[in-house]
Amino acid sequence: MSQSGADPEQRQQASEADAMAATFRASEHQHIRYNPLQDEWVLVSAHRMKRPWQGQVEPQLLKTVPRHDPLNPLCPGATRANGEVNPPYDGTFLFDNDFPALQPDAPDPGPSDHPLFRVEAARGVCKVMCFHPWSDVTLPLMSVPEIRAVIDAWASVTEELGAQYPWVQIFENKGAMMGCSNPHPHCQVWASNFLPDIAQREERSQQTYHNQHGKPLLLEYGHQELLRKERLVLTSEYWIVLVPFWAVWPFQTLLLPRRHVQRLPELTPAERDDLASTMKKLLTKYDNLFETSFPYSMGWHGAPMGLKTGATCDHWQLHAHYYPPLLRSATVRKFMVGYEMLAQAQRDLTPEQAAERLRVLPEVHYCLTQKDKETAATA
């Protein structure tokens, strides 16, 4: 009997037998991968990259941004919403967020009256950090010393706020696609009296791995990726940049120190210099991928501060996550909807393919290359 004449159960059994007989190729066949850091799975469906795109196309990014706009509340000398005037800063500038999500003096909600309606106190502070006085630059277009100043400021604010709060979250939302309406180069710093959900998952996962294997999870992971090489994007004397085996976003990367470091303030001067150079190279590659100012959300995760310092945090390894949404071009992004919201994360492009595309990109910014060409043409 031909398969077309078989009943549905026979056809399913035949299909499963064919699948088992085929040679698995991660670049061609769907599979799920485990994220040991955040204890979750991602569905990888590489064959979907062949499908035509008929979904939403984002508008082209604004080509020019004024270097200084007196009405921009992040510019030097500008007046912010609360009436305060920014100083004429020429480097980094840290100030209290005028519309904070966390405040230090919120009242205690008291005990919950039912286990299904738990409420706990949430206190903290929110700050904004400008990277540069000019609105028309981004981190990849800044100099290495300027980026080093940002890293020093990150370390300082982590130490300062960490003296009072166990979790200090540094994060940057770059581009309107990631909800950033102000093009001025800046990040945010939220410190809280509680560990957020993702920090709690990373705490549990790293503690469990350390208990079972006697070494930090991410330190061992970095060593393994250096041996395997296929997901590496950049390596330097002190840092590793890779597309994680379990990456969810198309060109997601993980930035890791080579040695065991728990928190940003622990980085040596040499490691900070190297980090500045590595960040510039990575973010230049991002911009060069689709020749656009590449949007992303990024942030640092390190061992909790305050009472959770010392030997109890030996399982932690400092790291930065970069989550860029672009998938096929400067105007086609990945959406986290439907299956991702109701079941689990899913991606099309494999992490290995993404790493290869980033790895081969030049480390000179396309804007600078274009300017050189224009200069040569008019010479």
From Swiss-Prot:
Zn(2+) 2 binds at E202, H301, H319, H321. GO terms for molecular function: D-glucose binding; galactose binding; UDP-glucose:hexose-1-phosphate uridylyltransferase activity; zinc ion binding. Its EC number is 2.7.7.12. InterPro entries: GalP_UDPtransf1, GalP_UDPtransf1_His-AS, GalP_Utransf_C, GalP_Utransf_N, HIT-like_sf. Gene3D superfamilies: HIT-like. Residues 1-20 are annotated as: Disordered. This is Galactose-1-phosphate uridylyltransferase. It comes from Rattus norvegicus (Rat).
